[in-house]
Design a protein with these regions (language model features):
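Non-transmembrane, aqueous-exposed alpha-helical and coiled segments at domain scale
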Residues: 1-321
């Protein structure tokens, strides 16, 4: 059975726990959208694993994990994540972690563009993580992006980055930020690309073969429905489709390959401090503590406020998720 796991709110609903539970009976785990601006925390025994780009199935032996074409991938960040997992005793090989050669790449100048654009918005800032996700997706949409396959060809990568930097540096200078040099960008990612090279492949035939063979595939959604670029609380959204359609376009598998969609929803939703259902009363906090213990993530980091689930909002998101 092939299953999509999506968040019905703003992310942080606990999808990682559900994916980890389903992975026990799965053969393949796929990440199809987003970047390292999202993360899943999985606790196995006494060990805590924090995943940003690597699918949760990496914690299980004999599971195949795929970073799909819909992901925007920071090669430096991914290598750091892999090294951290390896330090924790997780085995990562080209056999159990595949990276789509069509996945677009987040480069150092994307992060600076992200910061510049956020600063320029002033009071209309949207709270971006400044990890370059939006600019990378923007480059993809305007056909100025670079894919993993491009960067594995050194000469082509140098030419493409040089051309892209003309526009990027123009924007950065306009915002009073330092420009980037092609050689410096290449040098900064060269080591990471060498580390990732064995993992990069055309993942679409692999996924179609798994589907035809009747293997069980779990699609690990990132963020949540309210952050969907089309159906979320625009403009306070991410830059990709976080609903179930994003799993298909981000992996290369058609909708008919999907058997079920599981939506994960928190009773005390994250990101609710300014929502109509937010609560600031001591009695509410007492109830929360009785239900789920000391609230860390459900509360707004700035205001320390949680809220009741907004069912009238969650239900439409469930139907789209």
């Amino acid at each position: 059975m092939n299953t999509i796991v999506n968040g019905l709110q703003w992310g942080d609903e606990g999808k990682g726990k559900i994916v980890d539970y389903l992975t026990e009976d799965a053969d393949v785990v796929v990440r199809g959208q987003g970047g390292n601006n999202a993360g899943h925390t999985v606790i196995v025994g006494t060990s805590k694993y924090i995943l940003h780009l690597v699918p949760s199935g990496i914690l299980w032996e004999s599971k195949q994990n795929v970073i799909g074409n819909g992901v925007v991938l920071d090669p430096i960040g991914l290598v750091k994540e892999i090294e951290t997992l390896e330090d924790q005793g997780v085995t990562i090989t080209p056999e159990n972690l595949l990276i789509s050669d069509r996945a677009h790449v987040v480069l150092p100048y994307h992060c600076d563009l992200d910061a510049a654009q956020e600063q320029a918005r002033g009071k209309f800032s949207i709270g971006t993580t400044r990890r370059g996700i939006g600019p990378a997706y923007s480059d993809k949409a305007t056909r100025n992006g670079l894919r993993m396959a491009d960067l594995l060809n050194p000469e082509l990568a140098r030419d493409l980055i040089s051309v892209r930097l003309e526009d990027a540096n123009f924007t950065l200078k306009r915002h009073g930020m330092t420009s980037h040099e092609t050689a410096v960008v290449i040098d900064s990612i060269e080591g990471a690309l060498d580390r990732l090279r064995p993992h990069v492949t055309n993942t679409i035939p692999t996924l179609h073969e798994a589907w035809r063979d009747g293997k069980s595939i779990v699609f690990e959604g990132a963020q949540g429905t309210f952050l969907d670029i089309d159906f979320g609380t625009y403009p306070f959204v991410t830059s990709s489709n976080t609903t179930s359609g994003g799993a298909c376009t981000g992996s290369g598998l058609p909708p008919i390959a999907i058997d079920r969609v599981i939506g994960v929803c928190k009773a005390i939703p994250p990101g609710s401090a300014k929502a109509p259902t937010s609560q600031r009363t001591r009695s509410f906090q007492t109830i929360c503590t009785a239900w789920v213990g000391n609230l860390e993530q459900p509360q707004d980091e700035k205001d320390g406020v949680g809220g009741w689930i907004a069912c009238f909002s969650a239900l439409p998101q469930w139907s789209m998720g």
